[in-house]
Amino acid sequence: MVSRINTTSRFSSAPWFDEAQKLNVLIAGLGGIGSNVAYNIGRIHPNSMILYDNDVVEIDNISGQFYGLDDVNNNKVTAIANMLHSRCSYYNIYANNERLISPVKVEADVMISGFDNMSSREYIFKMWLDSNSKLLIDGRMSAEYFQIFALCKEDTSNIYTYQNNYLFADFMAESGVCSYKQTTFMATMIGSVITNVFVNYCTNLAYDKMKSKGYSEEDIDFLPRDIPFLTTYDASTMMFQTKY
């Protein structure tokens, strides 16, 4: 087995590293978004990773999700756990082969939604509101476009905007052509950017901790980082946009 220290040695001095390893991370939905997020955050070795999905890997999933031919017919949570073992030397995983729906309640420091339907997004949002979690990340994507929402508990205005403008009935969501719903390059990209939001959050935790210990801004050798409320990317124009 590859030792834990070797698998993180290239970034272990990052300002966010120590705080990231203290957090318990929930990833709900292991399709194109969740499977790629699990891989990226798994490489960081958080304190624990809690996975929820009740699906089985199918051949069609391989075109845009982090699975291989050997995973077909296996439960997604099992396939992702095995991938984290073999590719990340990471084992602090709670793999739940079930849907995250009522009456299931989960506590985690960070909650990440990789769902492909609005009812599940609404459920995890309400669960997050009632939890002790400080950060909710909601990823949404099509074949060549993605959106990432990041909500912090203190951002009451953004929470209101998200709840009233971005949670709507499933029938109101755009439905794409069956053979043009997902691409590997966009799935890996959104997984990376969601992980970027996660490490920015961890950087701010580290910064706030140093400030609370009496360090001045001049004494801290890194700056707090932005966490946009909404990040979008359009592959056709190769343009990122962020809103705060």
Question: PLM features: what roles do these ranges have?
Answer:
Residues 62, 100, 141:
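Hydrophobic pocket-lining residues within nucleotide cofactor-binding pockets
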Residues 21-45, 50-56:
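Glycine-rich adenosine-cofactor-binding loop
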Residues 90-95:
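Hydrophobic/aromatic anchor residues within beta-strands of the central parallel beta-sheet
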Residues 96-102:
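Conserved SAM/SAH-binding loop
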